Amino acid sequence: MATVASALRDEGFGATVTYSRKLFLPLTQLCRDVCHYCTFAKTPKKLGAAYMTVEQVLEQVREGERLGCKEALFTLGERPERRYRAAREALEQMGFTSTLEYLAHVAGRVLAETSVLPHINAGCMTDEEIALLRPVSASMGIMLETASDRLGEKGMPHYGSPDKVPARRLETIDRAGAAAVPFTSGILIGIGETRRERVESLLALRQLQQRHGHLQEIIIQNFRAKPGTQMAESPEPDLQELVWTIAIARLIFGARMSLQAPPNLSPGVLPQLIAAGINDWGGVSPMTPDYVNPEAPWPEVERLTRETAQCGKFLHQRLTVYPRYVRDSATWLAPEVRSRVLAHCDGEGMPREDSWLTGSGRGLPNRDREWLERAGQLSAPLNISPAIATVLDRASSVQGANELSVADIEVLFSARNDDFAAVCRAADQLRQQRCGETVSYVVNRNINYTNVCYFKCQFCAFSKGKLSENLRGRPYDLSAEEISRRACEAWERGASELCLQGGIHPEYTGQTYLDIVHTLRRATPGAHIHAFSPLEVWQGAQTLGVTLAEFLQRLKAAGLDSMPGTAAEILDDTVRAELCPDKINTAQWLEVMEASHRVGLRTTATIMFGHIDNYQSWARHLVSIRDLQRRTGGFTEFVPLPFVASESPIYLKGRARRGPTLREALLMHAVARLVFHGTIDNIQASWVKMGVEGVQACLHAGANDVGGTLMNETITRAAGAQHGQEMSPQAFEQLITAAGRRARPRNTLYGDADPAQLRRARQARPLQPPENTPASRYEREKLVTDIIATA
């Protein structure tokens, strides 16, 4: 049975075993129940104070925060004020009428003043009490222990404990499900129950799970006899009983339920517990004891990591709220909690493990740097999980890469530890095979002609309306003369490419975009005009009442040479519905790209990731790009654009993550290299998003291009990035050489750069201050005829 259970666990969780780094807060050890095995509950005479003070709690939580704890486990006796005068008087003195009211206050302070997330074990609760605690906790729990009324009869362990009546506990679990609370429950074995009663208890929990879907984990806890209790001499369940119960629980709940056994209660036999089907060790504290089982100290995380690895599994930290609930946080978390959880997690719903942020200028975390170095050591053996090994083997051929499914690609994005190193190694080897040791860059200039936009993209800190001047400056709409001046200046400074995009000004039409191209072509006849996202093209065609193909032909005739594949964000309409609901949808974006390719306009392809998306949406995006490229061959490169959060409206509203982790950012480049094997050879790393060190890391994870010098970069800086507005050719070449590669200046379409322009770029004078013409009610003229061409 354990063999089947273990296989089920592997189906659901692969090689990952999780734990939560927590601190244990016994808010009160007074309790009205008298469980015969319990040493947690104390009488007032044995306690210095009825309750921990807020200051004591915060002091411990801040120490736990310093030690890397992400969970504050509040455990307390049930309704002590109904039994003890000391509890009632203490609550009255603090200004509270009940223990749970005080608990809500304390947990709220922890949530507001620290980065640690409260998990609350408050016992049996009413609907009103659950509603009181939901806004101050990421998750809650109550051990069912048993569904057998027999264990509450005289002489049995729950006799005299009104809160241990199974119906009351099941009612609380049911209420929590109705309130959409991520919830923990489980059973306690070895307290006099039969195997049949264990199964009946697990089936009762499964019934509630089928009704609400809120049980994030099931704990199988083995009884430990404790001196000084009525059950001090009772026999403890042996290992065979524990293994049997874990295995039967896995069979009852299936592959996807997280199944936990506390490691401190079974020292020396952890491999047997893994073999029985668990995938989680529960909370492990680096600082506080297990107050419920004080005789059983927590194992050190380092030792737990080693013992887990000996079973062929990777130990990984999780939050108190499990990944699948984080990924649907709008449903499962109160708004007050959701923002705190999203700030802590990655795209899988696991905790961020370092302080690196896109665009922040912070150095690379040692952990990821070490894994990347390990990937580059080809002789270093890697312990690769079977799922990753299978997908990497398929991706090694063009045909196999073209057949990778969304599920296959999700597996690659979930890679951690040795799996992460293996994916980066495979991508780097493929990069070497397809592109050699050169890294290319282009001398170009960004010209963002307006930051006025009538679209309401939730991530955008660049576009300006009348309410956003206090964030990033005043709305502007460049005149034709300023556009022309910037283009001429760019050419004189060695640029071969002019890259133009902007907001969708409500007064702009397709003629506006045609006028911009005419102005640029008159000013700089020799420059490559790389302009207009699919959104601008779609809007331009609509306003002129012509087809996409006709409008694109007009743009091309006016002098447009190629197009950026921006406005893609995430090509998954479930994400776009919240991220950019009024923007073109996935099918429309792909339609513009295909039409562009059909009229002979090459384009880039992009992804903007790390906000409200997940690995499935990333995979869908890559598949959409790959499949279109197989039809048209029109994409020149793929450009991952990690989300910069700090000034983004959706992040400031608490509805998005803080951008991808470094692991995720590197994997996006690596996985793209593998998925686009034989279809898109150029994978570009964005220096304005990743920074110099980040770009160099990407060059060892599948990237072969570092983009453009830019001269003026405003969109990413508006979102809060700190990496500057221009990267000179000399700086690019220093960056590339330091990464052990050879620099190759290029043009937009990946041919060699013009030597004359490159000489100009190396001797470029400082930029003149740009003039951002203030926006007025109507658009400014974009066509001028009295221009003296510079090239």
Q: Can you say where each PLM-predicted feature lies in the sequence?
A:
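N-terminal [4Fe-4S]-dependent radical SAM core
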Residues: 1-36, 40-51, 55-56, 60, ...
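Auxiliary Fe-S-binding modules of radical SAM enzymes
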Residues: 1-3, 10-12, 58, 65, ...
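Conserved, mostly hydrophobic/aromatic
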Residues: 5, 35, 74, 142, ...
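Mobile, glycine- and charge-enriched loop segments
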Residues: 9, 17, 21, 31-32, ...
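Hydrophobic faces of well-ordered beta-strands that scaffold small-molecule active sites
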Residues: 19-23, 72-74, 118-120, 140-142, ...
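Conserved short loop/turn motifs at secondary-structure junctions
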Residues: 21-26, 118-122, 189-192, 260-263, ...
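Short, small-residue-rich loop/turn micro-motifs
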Residues: 29-31, 39, 76-78, 144-148, ...
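Conserved Radical SAM active-site core
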Residues: 44-210, 394, 464-627
